[in-house]
């Protein structure tokens, strides 16, 4: 087995379901880790056949990549909620960059299975996700790739479920939005699609809220919010002014919440902290009717005290 910067690989790194990286497991000081190798950028060697000018340009690009990733990971490390998978190490070895996290075991539970749970168990899972999202949003982090594959679900001893949020590779600091913001079209927000052709479109953490609205609908019903057959994706319908149909399988307060999360205007989507408060109060009291609410400067169909932070 190979060794990378003191991490002993358990086997060959693989590209399976990995996108632009390789991954695998490793150990260091008897502790098990997950390791990811970035396929790009590749740090050039001074002995390469490239011209010195090209080598220096590529080295600067790599150094900027390292600085930006390091800043992002350091910010993420402040969000140790227990439900975010924190980056434990980030380094360059030879020409490649590597990222290390704890090894986390997942039970491979898809949204359809979650939809069969009792309401209190579904609400508990959603609360655990919102708790983590609120933490990294308030630290200025945007995940930008919220979807079931990036939620490692695990059943607890009392048969409830918790989620660890993984794969922040598409993530960025809200203060430093990259030129190229993408995502899975199934969970893409309207403004991310618009940004692909218009760089002036503002991108914020509310792209995660839109994706969570779709994900929570799946967790509750096992299906996506309904749109007419002319649309392939939820964001397409929303851009055309069509409100996705939220299943009546969801309680009224959940239905209202998801509808707000799927608003065209990002400013009309509640913050993760507001949503967490909703689930902690309405969910715990088993109320189905939502009174009026104000979240900072925005008004929604449920109540949050004005001194709530």
Segments the model singles out, each with a brief description of its role:
Residues 136-154:
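Catalytic-loop of the protein kinase fold
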Residues 262-274:
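A conserved short helix/loop substructure at the end of the activation segment
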Residues 285-309:
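Regulatory extensions appended to serine/threonine kinase catalytic cores
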Residues 249-264:
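Conserved C-terminal C-lobe helix
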Residues 22-70, 74:
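ATP-binding glycine-rich loop module of kinase domains
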Residues 86-97:
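Short beta-strand micro-motifs within the conserved protein kinase catalytic domain, predominantly
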Residues 125-126:
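Activation segment signature within eukaryotic-like protein kinase domains
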């Amino acid at each position: 087995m190979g060794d990378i910067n003191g991490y002993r690989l358990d086997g060959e790194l693989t590209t399976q379901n990995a996108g632009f990286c390789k991954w695998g497991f490793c150990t260091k000081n008897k502790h098990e880790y997950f390791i990811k190798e970035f396929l790009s950028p590749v740090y050039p060697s001074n002995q390469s056949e490239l011209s010195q000018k090209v080598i220096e340009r590529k080295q600067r690009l790599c150094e900027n990549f390292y600085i930006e990733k390091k800043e992002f990971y350091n910010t993420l490390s402040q969000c140790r909620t227990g439900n975010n998978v924190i980056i434990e190490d980030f380094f360059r070895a030879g020409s490649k960059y590597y990222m290390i996290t704890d090894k986390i075991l997942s039970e491979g539970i898809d949204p359809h299975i979650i939809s069969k749970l009792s309401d209190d168990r579904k609400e508990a899972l959603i609360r655990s996700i919102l708790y983590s999202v609120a933490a990294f949003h308030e630290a200025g982090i945007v995940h930008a790739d919220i979807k079931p594959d990036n939620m490692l679900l695990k059943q607890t001893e009392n048969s409830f479920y918790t989620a660890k949020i993984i794969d922040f590779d598409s993530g960025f600091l809200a203060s430093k939005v990259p030129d190229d913001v993408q995502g899975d079209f199934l969970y893409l927000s309207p403004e991310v699609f618009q940004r692909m052709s218009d760089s002036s479109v503002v991108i914020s953490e509310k792209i995660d809220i839109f994706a969570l609205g779709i994900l929570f609908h799946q967790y509750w019903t096992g299906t996506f919010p309904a749109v007419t057959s002319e649309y392939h994706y939820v964001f397409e319908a929303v851009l055309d002014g069509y409100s996705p149909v939220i299943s009546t399988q969801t309680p009224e307060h959940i239905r209202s919440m998801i509808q707000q999360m799927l608003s065209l205007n990002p400013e009309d989507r509640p913050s993760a902290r507001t949503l967490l408060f909703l689930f902690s109060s309405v969910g715990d009291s088993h109320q189905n009717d939502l009174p009026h609410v104000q979240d900072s400067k925005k008004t929604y169909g449920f109540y949050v005290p004005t001194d709530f932070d």
